[in-house]
Amino acid sequence: MKTNLLNYDLQGLTRHFADMGEKPFRAKQVMRWMHQSGAQNFNEMTDLAKSLRHKLNEQAGIEIPKLMMSQKSSDGTRKWLLDVGTGNGVETVFIPESDRGTLCISSQVGCALECTFCSTGRQGFNRNLTAAEIIGQLWWANKAMGVTPKNERVISNVVMMGMGEPMANFDNVVTALSIMLDDHGYGLSRRRVTVSTSGMVPQMDRLRDVMPVALAVSLHASNDEVRNQIVPLNKKYPLKELMAACQRYLVKAPRDFITFEYVMLDGINDKAQHARELIELVTDVPCKFNLIPFNPFPNSGYERSSNENIRVFRDILQQAGFVVTVRKTRGDDIDAACGQLAGQVQDKTRRQQKWQQILIGQQG
């Protein structure tokens, strides 16, 4: 079986070429061809000796996930469904703005966590994505938009906020991050690459030590009682532990704050008292808040908070001195908004079946 070179960062690629009896600079050449020029064929790599190209064609490949579906929203947001084999597909979303272009990347086929307000969580879980399947989303997005990072940068920011919990696929995510940041890869700034987590505390500490990029925490609640219900991982890593991990992360973080993501659920976590509890909770954590109006999906059981409740919630936080943004919903007409990504998951957890049985019971 041929080796997929997209699975390697520069360090891994250098070792691979050493095993082939080649010099280290060859790894840099091939990495630039793959990621900066979008090459998918070794014969395109004209500064490699023909003998090396022949050897690579015999032993290796550049395997990119295949496109299953492409959609474009009325607001310019683009979504791609990529085939990762055995009936599974993952979704990648590009969000254009006047001052940046942000790509939202998936890390798993489905998600092993069961956040109750998230469409991905309802789909169950199949497997972790390989490093090639993660970085292949960035490769594909550039290709789909007709650009190469060497000549034109359309994607300025990457957020690991698509399908899956990135920290639960730690090693492959770190390899992909290494490629994103490498000057021979995509040359992105650590400040412009964000990993989102629901609060896997040990992995937060590991990421701080090996690949400190910007960090977003899917908080969504101001107390353990509510968070236990909507983010079950909280039962393992409660808020006190999570806040301590955030403080530790900031010691090496490229930004001097944590971004707390907070989905606004009507009647669940959107009252003035919740905002005041949040202020108390994050007293020792430099942070900003990103309030996310809930994006509905079929049979979710939740409603979006009213604009008035969101405004009051925001004002309480701002008056306490916090930077607060209310996320503008983008791409909801193509189910590309936050919490709507579902992809195509061959579930191994029986979670899809469980939710179907619950819905049938409710309808009966």
Curated annotation (Swiss-Prot):
Compartments reported by the entry: Cytoplasm
Cofactor: [4Fe-4S] cluster
Keywords recorded for this protein, A-Z: 4Fe-4S, Cytoplasm, Disulfide bond, Iron, Iron-sulfur, Metal-binding, Methyltransferase, rRNA processing, S-adenosyl-L-methionine, Transferase, tRNA processing
EC class (word): transferase
Active site residues according to the UniProt entry: 91, 338
GO process annotations (BP): rRNA base methylation; tRNA methylation
Enzyme Commission numbers on file: 2.1.1.192
InterPro entries reported in the protein's UniProt record: Aldolase_TIM (IPR013785), Methyltransferase_A (IPR040072), RlmN_N (IPR048641), RNA_MTrfase_RlmN (IPR027492), rRNA_lsu_MTrfase_RlmN/Cfr (IPR004383), rSAM (IPR007197)
A GO cellular component annotation in the UniProt record: cytoplasm
Domain Radical SAM core as annotated: residue spans: 97-333
Binding positions for S-adenosyl-L-methionine per the UniProt entry: 164-165, 196, 218-220, 295
Keyword 4Fe-4S in annotation: yes
Catalytic activity: adenosine(2503) in 23S rRNA + 2 reduced [2Fe-2S]-[ferredoxin] + 2 S-adenosyl-L-methionine = 2-methyladenosine(2503) in 23S rRNA + 5'-deoxyadenosine + L-methionine + 2 oxidized [2Fe-2S]-[ferredoxin] + S-adenosyl-L-homocysteine; adenosine(37) in tRNA + 2 reduced [2Fe-2S]-[ferredoxin] + 2 S-adenosyl-L-methionine = 2-methyladenosine(37) in tRNA + 5'-deoxyadenosine + L-methionine + 2 oxidized [2Fe-2S]-[ferredoxin] + S-adenosyl-L-homocysteine
Disulfide partners: 104-338
Positions contributing to [4Fe-4S] cluster binding: 111, 115, 118
GO molecular function: 4 iron, 4 sulfur cluster binding; metal ion binding; rRNA (adenine(2503)-C2-)-methyltransferase activity; rRNA binding; tRNA (adenine(37)-C2)-methyltransferase activity; tRNA binding
Cofactor annotation remark: Binds 1 [4Fe-4S] cluster. The cluster is coordinated with 3 cysteines and an exchangeable S-adenosyl-L-methionine.
Homology family: Belongs to the radical SAM superfamily. RlmN family.
Note in the entry: Reaction proceeds by a ping-pong mechanism involving intermediate methylation of a conserved cysteine residue.
Role according to the record: Specifically methylates position 2 of adenine 2503 in 23S rRNA and position 2 of adenine 37 in tRNAs. m2A2503 modification seems to play a crucial role in the proofreading step occurring at the peptidyl transferase center and thus would serve to optimize ribosomal fidelity.
Protein name as catalogued: Dual-specificity RNA methyltransferase RlmN
Phylogenetic placement of the source organism: Bacteria, Pseudomonadati, Pseudomonadota, Betaproteobacteria, Neisseriales
